[in-house]
């Protein structure tokens, strides 16, 4: 259930792999699992990342009396980075909602965020397509649209130009990725927009307009070269 990056920029899976005995099994549980809803008896959904089916069955039995539906994934790197990065991208939805950019923009952000997320997951050693499942798309939509979402609210604050209280997994992830240069942020324009807004929260609307213009130009250039 542990997620995020530690102060050395490592995922929980990397820490487990480096510190547990070679034959010690471990599992990672990620997906749309809002705790208040689980306590209220509502269903939640998750991917359980582990290397063997026996571990999956053991963990599934542990949650037998909880309305938590699990699927199995062997792509531990992929689900790890999907759930880590979704908190970053969720802030973009909060910014867009605060700026009243509209439902069309929200739909656009879902597509672009998943495209970038898939590319990053591949770069970080995961499998193509993993972000389109529960740990990625499922958790992103939940985090990006829930009225109780901390990261959606962070995005709203950034759009208002507020700089205090901008804390959480998303801002910490941005800091670690930048500090340790885990990947080239400039290769992912929406991710770069979010990073820029966290660093300098003035004129977030202008950042979106610049992003849309660049996206349009890139799309036009791509269509002519195909």
Predicted regions and their residues:
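Rossmann-like NAD(P)(H) cofactor-binding subdomain of soluble oxidoreductases
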Residues: 1-42, 59
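Generic structural "secondary-structure junction" signal
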Residues: 7, 36, 40, 81-83, ...
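NAD(P)-dependent Rossmann-like dehydrogenase/reductase catalytic/cofactor-binding core
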Residues: 86, 93-94, 122-226
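Short beta-strands and strand-loop turn motifs
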Residues: 1-2, 73, 191
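Internal alpha-helical scaffold of NAD(P)-dependent oxidoreductase catalytic cores
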Residues: 15-25, 43-130
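Glycine-rich beta-alpha junction loops
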Residues: 5, 30-36, 52, 74-79, ...
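Short glycine-/small-residue-rich Rossmann-like dinucleotide-binding loops
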Residues: 3, 50-51, 146
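Short alpha-helical
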Residues: 7, 54, 149
């Amino acid at each position: 259930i542990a997620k995020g990056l530690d102060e050395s920029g490592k995922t929980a899976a990397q820490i487990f792999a480096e510190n547990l005995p070679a034959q010690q099994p471990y599992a990672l549980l990620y997906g749309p699992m809002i705790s208040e809803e689980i306590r209220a008896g509502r269903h939640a959904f998750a991917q359980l990342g582990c290397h063997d089916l026996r571990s999956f069955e053991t963990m599934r039995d542990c949650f037998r009396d909880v309305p938590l539906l699990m699927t199995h994934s062997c792509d531990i790197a992929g689900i790890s980075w999907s759930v880590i990065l979704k908190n970053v991208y969720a802030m973009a939805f909060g910014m867009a909602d605060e700026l009243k950019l509209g439902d069309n923009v929200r739909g656009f952000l879902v597509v672009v965020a998943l495209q970038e997320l898939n590319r990053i997951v591949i770069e970080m050693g995961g499998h193509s397509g993993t972000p389109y499942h529960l740990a990625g798309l499922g958790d992103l939509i939940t985090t990006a649209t829930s009225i109780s979402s901390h990261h959606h609210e962070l995005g709203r604050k950034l759009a208002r130009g507020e700089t205090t209280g901008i804390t959480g997994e998303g801002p910490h992830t941005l800091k670690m990725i930048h500090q340790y240069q885990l990947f080239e942020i400039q290769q992912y324009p929406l991710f770069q927009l979010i990073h820029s807004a966290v660093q300098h929260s003035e004129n977030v609307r202008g950042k979106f307009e610049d992003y849309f213009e660049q996206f349009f130009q890139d799309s036009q250039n791509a269509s002519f070269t195909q």
